[in-house]
Structures are given as structure tokens and as C-alpha cells.
Amino acid sequence: MSGRGKGGKGLGKGGAKRHRKILRDNIQGITKPAIRRLARRGGVKRISALVYEETRAVLKLFLENVIRDAVTYTEHAKRKTVTSLDVVYSLKRQGRTIYGFGG
């Protein structure tokens, strides 16, 4: 247990962070213009008003899956820092291989 601080080996079982801001409704940070820009890049001309909430929901689900896998890789390697390779491997596991980030 040397060099691990008071958290021990279990990554999610450390002491509580003292000034941790509670994150709520951050998905609204993906703004309407940001979604519109992504759609424009994909060749979309007009966008229905219902698209924005649906896009946020799908993006949240996608990121939850990628981050869950990346954190699993990190925990398996007994690290506390998620690396770009963890994300690359988690995307590869989901069938979305990307290049240019190592691995």
C-alpha cells in the first residue's frame, strides 16, 4: 500500500473530497448552437426543435458507456488517472476504432 495515500487500493473507496462541487444538468452545457454546428458539419440544412434534447440524451449515453469502459481499464491497471489509451481501447471495444492517439 505504499505511495497510495489514504485511499488504499480500492479506487472508489478513498477519503471524501472536501470541496467537490455537485455536478447536475451539465448536459445542458452542450448548447443548441453547438449541436447545430455539428449537424451543419454533417450536411444538415434544417433542424427540428425536438432534435436538441434527443441529441443530448444520445450523447450522454454514448459518453457514459465510453467513460465506464475507460475507467474499467484504468482500475484494472491499478491507476487513478484515465489515459488517452484507456479511451482508445474503450472505443475500440465498442467497435469505433480511432487512430492517432497511440495504441
Curated annotation (Swiss-Prot):
Q: Which InterPro entries does the entry mention?
A: CENP-T/H4_C, Histone-fold, Histone_H4, Histone_H4_CS
What does the PTM comment of the record read? Glutarylation at Lys-92 (H4K91glu) destabilizes nucleosomes by promoting dissociation of the H2A-H2B dimers from nucleosomes.
Query: Which residues are annotated with the PTM Phosphoserine?
Result: 48
State if Nuclease is listed as a keyword: no
PTM-bearing positions, type N6-methyllysine: 6, 9, 13
Citing just one GO molecular function, the answer is: structural constituent of chromatin
Subunit text: The nucleosome is a histone octamer containing two molecules each of H2A, H2B, H3 and H4 assembled in one H3-H4 heterotetramer and two H2A-H2B heterodimers. The octamer wraps approximately 147 bp of DNA.
Give residue numbers for the modification (N6-glutaryllysine).
Answer: 92
Please give the residue positions where the record annotates the modification N6-(2-hydroxyisobutyryl)lysine.
9
- Where is it located? Nucleus; Chromosome
UniProt signal peptide = none
Q: What is this protein called?
A: Histone H4
Q: Which residues cross the membrane?
A: none
Q: Name one GO biological process term.
A: nucleosome assembly
Q: Which UniProt keywords apply?
A: Acetylation, Chromosome, DNA-binding, Hydroxylation, Methylation, Nucleosome core, Nucleus, Phosphoprotein
